Amino acid sequence: KTAVSEHTDWADWKANWDKIKTNYEQVALIPGSDFSKLNFGWYSKEKANEAVVRIADNKDMKNAKEFKGTCTEGTVINGVQYYSNKVTADGFEPNTTYYYQVKLNGKWQQAHEYKTGDPHNFSFMYVGDPQIGASKGQVPNESAVEQSEDVAARNDAYNWNKTLNSALAQHPEINFLVSPGDQINEPAGNNAEKHLLQEYEYSGYLSATAFRNLPQAVAIGNHDCLTTSYQNHFNVPNPFTAETNSTVAGHGYYYTYGSALFIVINANNYNAADHKALVEKAVKENPNAKWRIVVMHQDIYGSGLDHSDSDGIILRNQLTPIFDANDIDVVLQGHDHTYARTYQLTSDGKQYDDFAEYKVGQHGQDHKVLDNKLKSDSAFKEYYTSQNRCYTIADMKQGTLVNPEGVFYMTSNSATGSKFYNLIEQQQDYVAARSQTWRPTYSVINITDDKFTINTYDAQTGTPIDEAYSIIKR
């Protein structure tokens, strides 16, 4: 069931939901291509010659500097044309407080604060599948009736606000947020009525007050990949437009923050050659990055019942050697709505079937050809499983590892509680720890020039659900 708060703000949230869900013009802050930059994305009803943001070091916006970007045709919502505004601002210094304003429909909006952190010692919040609207059909605590899609979006967006506020109150050191995808639940596709519902969900997702000050780096999930809304809302840095099999939502991208290189893969694209090219390009352009972190939606090494032995691993035996060859340290995943972390894994160096015939015309939101074959042919399923034993467990130590070999994979559970899956019955040998608490969780990752540490917490109580895992590189 969807959790609700006992506090009075729940009543206020319900009363204001119709305004919240139709507020399509909310601003998303996104990390820039490096620490000194910050990207902005927002919808507007009016077309402008250029999008404009201004930055100052005071809330009165005296001596503010203007930055200009693009304003292009975006999403049509309920018959109304909206425009997608994108701006990049630069010149940000460490440990400094700034204020920003965006110009919306010809008027400057309220100024909001943005604080930079320390690029040599920073933290980010890592969340799994907020998937606003996914609790549809569930029976909430205060009713005996199954939730409609609209009520589900309302409740999930409320819980999303709660998770973010709780995390930031307990961990004020958080500098930005990373989501491996599925910000919303409704795929929509070409259905205008469903697309309206999808935009309600995006409004609920972006309504979080934390996002007025907190940049977010989000991947494309399978529920995000069928419309242009993702790329219209989020102004991602270094989009990999050379991707040959991209989805309409957009592309993979990459950015640096301090000593870390983040490579965000659009794993709904089943062409591994595209992902290889993106990883190699990002690494080549940032050869001195101490940490190399991949973010992707599908969990090629997870432990959820729904995906970790089926469509979720269709790219495993191709991506594993790519990550090895490019010295990736960590892969942050979602998709399976369960918690799991692996041992240090490497490719076993062998050649495997890439199941190309099951990828033609298929993608992250449509993999019926593979699903049907796995369900109808037990011999094929056994073969499919055998061809995904493409890894070697390089190190089984726990706690703090020093200069370990291999890649660490993590799958995050739902940050909103909108949807959970069971764990797969037989725990895989690559899994070091896993759980399903049926409660929203989030992780906080701290990175210094020589140490990576991840801790995961219950969103309501703030208590750890697992021991810390750290990697030291010397």
Predicted region positions:
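Acidic, histidine-bearing metal-coordination/catalytic regions of metal-dependent phosphoesterases
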Residues: 1-147, 169-170, 402, 420, ...
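Extended active-site neighborhood of metal-dependent phosphoesterases/phosphodiesterases
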Residues: 86-89, 97-116, 139, 144-150, ...
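Active-site environment of divalent metal-dependent phosphoester hydrolases
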Residues: 132-136, 184-188, 220-228, 271-273, ...
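Acidic/histidine-rich helix-loop elements
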Residues: 66-79, 126-162, 187, 191-194, ...
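Catalytic-core region of carbohydrate-active enzymes that cleave or remodel glycosidic bonds
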Residues: 200-208, 314-336, 439-440
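Active-site neighborhood of phospho(di)ester-bond hydrolases with catalytic His/Asp-centered motifs
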Residues: 126-128, 176-182, 216-222, 265-266, ...
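Active-site-adjacent substrate/metal-binding segments within catalytic domains
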Residues: 126, 159-178, 184-189, 265
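Short acidic, glycine-rich surface-loop motifs adjacent to enzyme active sites
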Residues: 180-187, 286-306
